[in-house]
Amino acid sequence: MPETASATRRHLRRAARSRGVSVAAPQLDFDWASRFLQRRTVPSVEMITGDQIERVVWLDTRRRPVAARAVRLCIRNELPRRTTTRQTIGRLTIAATPDLSAATLRAAIVRMFDLDADLGSFLAIARRDPVLAPVVATNPRGLRLLQLLDPFEALLRAILGQQVSVAAASTMTDRLVRRVGTPGPRAWTSDVVPLLRPRYAFPRPGAVAELGPARLRGLGLTRAKAAAVHGAATAVASGQLNLARLRVASPDEADRMLLSLPGVGPWTATYVRLRALGDRDAFPAADLGLIRALTALGVTRDRFQAAAERWRPWRGYATLHLWHSLGSGVPVLA
């Protein structure tokens, strides 16, 4: 019998507390982070329930690609839901099945929430800037660049999100995962958590490549999008696009690597840098949400780049706050 949402939350809470690792999360507005992630949830992979996140991910547990395995993570916000603006030091608890070392868990959560970013340096620039000052003032608890641990997932989600709504992109992604995703661990332990909704890790590149463009179109993708997804998967599976090299590439090199793929343009490449490569200076100048936000703040199109130059090396964080200024906290695309 399927469990209720409240029962699921209780099970996740027990799992996270029973064997979790606690990590300080300064200047993190978890309510905002939860809304950001909920809006783009892929149900077969992840579940967000307010103060908790459960996700099946590919995690390199021995720092070698061949050691990557599907892991179920449970992340819980230990900060009280209602906080004052002075309470900026929160804590996150992370647990995993199969069990992982404390160091591996800490590294994962720091990366997912970009917790090692010195937001003080960004805010020092933003609070002096005529465009950003009123924007950052509206969120004193802090926004952080939320990261996907798998660059391949970020790449495919960016392609699937081209020129469609967030909901449509999530639906297509979920269909792909259900078709060729890798089954993940089903429970924390038999006496703690029964079967939970997220059941799969994101598909491996080879599995997506084997589908071929025709079967990808059967999932609701356009001809062009199916070709782009297949091309990206084939490039990664064959080694033409080396994800290990992409992770450590300079921004210019990362752009060259990504833009060499069919159907990948500047917006998609920048999105991958923002969401998977931890590039805090990535700036998607052509993003419609960013354009709307800057226009609403009185910055004309011919002054976008000049304004952005003042925000280096934090243009990615400036982008995040500008998106948030629109009210939704997310870009127009996926």
What are these regions (language model features)?
Residues M1-A334:
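HhH-family (HhH-GPD) DNA N-glycosylase catalytic core used in base-excision repair
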